[in-house]
């Protein structure tokens, strides 16, 4: 039983040692210089926050052609970037060497930097190629002497060396052989001592007795960081430059306006941040291990996917080779057939010519026929023979080979195919689509249209994402609604919320994966449900002057002789003909919205709404011509001035003329066909591509909007005591086009009065 407990204890100890060893080996990677791949020796902090050994940095600068900026390795340090030399055992303390004369000569102008003329106005900027981030770091004109030593990293390296060293005791440097183990160190003397030697070399009552002993070490560092410019202890930290500064640096013009804080505050802030970050990492070790397992699984999948990709590419290339081989066989077969046909024709021609030789073939037969003396028999045989001889004679006189020996028509032009094969590469994901803002709009539904850039790889399908931007943001990442696998380059989003702002984006997908998202496009939905209706020209419309389209969604006023004949006085021009077109649907409750486009060349068009009864009464029984100052029952009789409460107007129109919107000083100027109180101060605004009309039946208000930006143009009161329907008035030439609904067209609503009530 005791043996089992001992074995368990031994196993736990060994496991702990293995974990410690693994931890130390993993930490060793952080303590290696990126240049020499050995543990840091006197590391310097580069402006990019990476570290490098001073000797390695000096060597790199020498390779770059910078001379006199690395400092003398044997010199005593005059700045934190310089490093003291380690004194050999049993040697007296060396005197301080002189500062680096070469660096002073270069600064004073007696020396020159490589590539810099003597007496140049601007000092040379030294670039150091950082081996960690692979970028050039500016060191300034001071070179390495302007950098700080990373004393903390030195201490970590020293502690690591002591923890992994076996029997690596530090010996006294002043003892006679054999030296004893060192117990103290002295930064001022830069040596390690045993107890006896420390007392011997630091006698009581002398200045050396004031030296503060430290732990024994082989690497002596300055007590603190010193400013490389003023040789003063750094006491502040410049947040703007992200650099430690001394009291003199703090008041210099270089740091004027910078955020400077005491080094204690910077120390505490950075320590708190580092502690919190480290605590978070240590508290989420399970998450780290889970992510490591996920990465390992990703590596396995990568290996499998890579092998599958290789096999797929090999199979496709073999398929191309098979197609090429098949094509090669068919082309060679065609050449072979052409060759055999030509050889056959040439062989037949040779046979014909051989028959023309003396004593053979046709010539020999003709010679024998000429020997015939019986005239009838000769004529019988010579007739056919003569024809053959004539053809042979003609062929002899116009000799030409029966077939050409050239096969130029069998040459292949493989330039295009070679270019395609040369450009054969892996399929790329589609580029970010471009939203077609001219064709994208929001009406009863949202219609989104896009296209791919000219040289983009093809997309098999698209993903459309959308969300509302006018709702409170939920905690966490932004949530998008998606429409997956959209075919084509357009999409419909049904039933959007009214009076909202939607942001939409789209991206393509093919076998290579998903591409980048398009730029976001923001669309405003109508402020109320869209009203679907058709144009009805039976009330107040002249068929001679108004032309309504077959789908009853467009109307055009045609000026001409009928318009002139409709006026009672042709010469004065004080009377004009007004033609009215109404919608076939009336509104009795709720809010409704519709949009239309007015031809900018229209002379005078009024777009709006009115009470159904008042519109029929006014225009069905009104004279054919009216004065521009005539108000067809605006709802105000001659006694309206004495009424306590002014009645609401039965009509509300927006006036458009010659590409401009005519706005009066108030809503009353557009409440009817004309102003009630005569001319008023008015202004004009440009006509937008589409006009929107929003009717609030309960509130008795109608708003005219820019249907593209939904910017308000005019808001008017309206008498909503009965059914209200859309109305369009024309004076002179003009045209109006109702906006087509994005969805399926609704069925026509037909009632006995020509109007359907929308309840």
Curated annotation (Swiss-Prot):
SUPFAM superfamilies: B-box zinc-binding domain (SSF57845), Concanavalin A-like lectins/glucanases (SSF49899), Fibronectin type III (SSF49265), RING/U-box (SSF57850)
Chain ranges of zinc fingers (RING-type): 33-59, 172-231
ZnF region ranges: B box-type: 222-263
GO terms assigned for molecular function: microtubule binding; zinc ion binding
Official protein name in the record: Tripartite motif-containing protein 46
CDD domains: Bbox1_TRIM46_C-I (cd19849), Bbox2_TRIM46_C-I (cd19786), FN3 (cd00063), RING-HC_TRIM46_C-I (cd16757), SPRY_PRY_TRIM46 (cd12895)
GO terms for biological process, alphabetical: anterograde synaptic vesicle transport; axonogenesis; microtubule bundle formation; microtubule cytoskeleton organization; neuron migration; protein localization to axon; regulation of protein localization
Phosphoserine: residues bearing it: 330, 627
Homology family: Belongs to the TRIM/RBCC family.
Ranges for domain B30.2/SPRY: 526-747
Region (Disordered): 67-98
Binding positions for Zn(2+) per the UniProt entry: 227, 230, 249, 255
Reported tissue expression: Expressed in the central nervous system, including pyramidal neurons and interneurons in the cortex and hippocampus and all neuronal cell types in the cerebral and cerebellar cortex, and in the peripheral nervous system, including the dorsal root ganglion neurons.
Region (Required for microtubule association, proximal axon localization and axon formation), start-end ranges: 411-429
Coiled-coil ranges per UniProt: 322-400
Subcellular location: Cell projection, Axon; Cytoplasm, Cytoskeleton
Segments of this protein annotated with the region Required for proximal axon localization, axon formation and migration: 1-166
Key words, A-Z: Cell projection, Coiled coil, Cytoplasm, Cytoskeleton, Metal-binding, Phosphoprotein, Repeat, Zinc, Zinc-finger
GO CC term, one of those recorded: microtubule cytoskeleton
Chief place where the protein resides: other
Domain Fibronectin type-III, chain residue ranges per copy: 429-528
């Amino acid at each position: 039983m005791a043996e089992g407990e001992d074995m368990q204890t031994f196993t736990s100890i060994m496991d702990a040692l293995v974990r410690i060893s693994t931890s130390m080996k993993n930490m060793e990677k952080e303590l290696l210089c990126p240049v020499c791949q050995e543990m840091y020796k006197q590391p310097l902090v580069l402006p990019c926050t990476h570290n490098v050994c001073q000797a390695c940095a000096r060597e790199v600068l020498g390779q770059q052609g910078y001379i006199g900026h690395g400092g003398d390795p044997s010199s005593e340090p005059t700045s934190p970037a310089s490093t003291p030399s380690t004194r050999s055992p049993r040697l007296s303390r060396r005197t301080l060497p002189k500062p680096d004369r070469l660096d002073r000569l270069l600064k004073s102008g007696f020396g020159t930097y490589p590539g810099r003329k003597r007496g140049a106005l601007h000092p040379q900027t030294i670039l150091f190629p950082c081996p960690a981030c692979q970028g050039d770091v500016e060191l300034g004109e001071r070179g390495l002497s302007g950098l700080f030593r990373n004393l903390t990293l030195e201490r970590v390296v020293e502690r690591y060396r002591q923890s992994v060293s076996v029997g690596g005791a530090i010996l006294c440097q002043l003892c006679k052989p054999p030296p004893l183990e060192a117990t103290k160190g002295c930064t001022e003397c830069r040596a390690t001592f045993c107890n006896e030697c420390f007392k011997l070399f630091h006698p009581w009552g002398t200045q050396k007795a004031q030296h503060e002993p430290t732990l024994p070490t082989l690497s002596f560092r300055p007590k603190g960081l010193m400013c490389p410019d003023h040789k003063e202890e750094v006491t502040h930290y410049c947040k703007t430059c992200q650099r430690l500064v001394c009291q003199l640096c703090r008041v210099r013009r270089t740091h004027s306006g910078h955020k400077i804080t005491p080094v204690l505050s910077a120390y505490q802030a950075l320590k708190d941040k580092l502690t919190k970050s480290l605590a978070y990492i240590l508290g989420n070790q399970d998450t780290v291990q889970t992510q490591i397992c996920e990465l390992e699984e990703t590596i396995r999948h990568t290996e499998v996917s890579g092998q599958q990709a290789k096999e797929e590419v090999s199979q496709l290339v073999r398929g191309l080779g098979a197609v090429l081989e098949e094509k090669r066989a068919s082309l060679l077969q065609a050449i072979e057939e052409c060759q055999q046909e030509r050889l056959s024709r040439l062989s037949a021609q040779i046979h014909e010519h051989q028959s023309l030789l003396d004593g053979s073939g046709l010539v020999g037969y003709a010679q024998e026929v000429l020997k015939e003396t019986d005239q009838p028999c000769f004529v019988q045989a010579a007739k056919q023979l003569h024809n053959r001889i004539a053809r042979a004679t003609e062929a002899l006189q116009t000799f030409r080979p029966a077939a050409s020996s050239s096969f130029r028509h069998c040459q292949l032009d493989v330039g295009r195919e070679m270019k395609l094969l040369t450009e054969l590469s892996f399929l790329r994901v589609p580029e970010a689509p471009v939203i077609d803002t001219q064709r994208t709009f929001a009406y009863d539904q949202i219609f989104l249209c896009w296209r791919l850039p000219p040289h983009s790889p093809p997309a098999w399908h698209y993903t459309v994402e959308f969300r509302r931007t006018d709702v409170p943001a939920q905690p966490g990442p932004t949530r998008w609604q998606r429409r997956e696998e959209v075919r084509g380059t357009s999409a419909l989003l049904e039933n959007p919320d009214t009076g909202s702002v939607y942001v939409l984006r789209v991206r393509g997908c093919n076998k290579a994966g998903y591409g980048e998202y398009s730029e976001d496009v923001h669309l405003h939905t109508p402020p109320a449900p869209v009203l679907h209706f058709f144009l009805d020209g039976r009330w107040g419309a002249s068929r001679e002057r108004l032309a309504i389209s077959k789908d009853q969604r467009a109307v055009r006023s045609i000026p001409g002789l009928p318009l002139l004949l409709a006026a009672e006085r042709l010469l004065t021009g004080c009377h004009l003909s007004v033609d009215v077109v109404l919608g076939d649907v009336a509104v009795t409750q709720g809010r409704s919205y519709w949009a239309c486009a007015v031809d900018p060349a229209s002379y005078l068009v009024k777009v709006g709404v009115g009470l159904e009864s008042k519109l029929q009464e006014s225009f069905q029984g009104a004279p054919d011509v009216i004065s521009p100052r005539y108000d067809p029952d605006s709802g105000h009789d001659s006694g309206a001035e004495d009424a306590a409460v002014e009645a609401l107007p039965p009509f509300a129109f927006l006036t458009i003329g010659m590409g401009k919107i005519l706005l009066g000083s108030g809503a009353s100027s557009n409440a009817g066909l004309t102003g009630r109180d005569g001319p008023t101060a008015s202004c004009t605004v440009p006509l937008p591509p589409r006009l929107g009309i929003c009717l609030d039946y309960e509130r008795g208000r109608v708003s005219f909007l820019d249907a593209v930006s939904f910017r308000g143009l005019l808001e008017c009161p309206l008498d909503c005591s009965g059914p209200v329907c859309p109305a369009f008035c024309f004076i002179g030439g003009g045209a109006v086009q109702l906006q087509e609904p994005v969805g399926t067209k609704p069925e026509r609503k037909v009632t006995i009065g020509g109007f359907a009530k929308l309840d």
